[in-house]
Amino acid sequence: MIQVLLKYYSGMTPIKTAESHVVEALAALAQAQRLRAFRALVVAGSEGLTPSALAALLQIAPSALSFHLKALSHAGLVSAEASGRNLIYRAEFARMNDLLTYLTQDCCQGQSCAVVPEATQACC
């Protein structure tokens, strides 16, 4: 087992950049309000939500939501697009899928395991 791990971690140079992005994304999601906001945007799909609709849905102050959306945006998990006088926030599904792929890519050292295949399939 240790030899397999040493072999895996011996070529860390290209992974370091990926790891820093993963750590940044997980850190952004490691706060209850941000996690709820991200999940709400995932549910909203490609239509996205305005900050006011998202704040009402989550029952949090718009100023607090703004802080959380900035953190999620900085981590690349959400994007904002101007639509008239409003901003529309959307989950970045490609980033989310990259994160899930990174977390599960070497599951069980390539052997079959108890991971449910549907749980690791990409979304959207």
Where are these regions (language model features)?
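N-terminal helix-turn-helix DNA-binding core of bacterial DNA-binding proteins
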Residues: 16-61, 83-95
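Amphipathic alpha-helical dimerization/coiled-coil segments
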Residues: 1-21, 42-43, 93-124
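Short, hydrophobic-biased segments on the C-terminal half of alpha helices
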Residues: 69-70
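Alpha-helical residues within the helix-turn-helix
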Residues: 56, 73-74
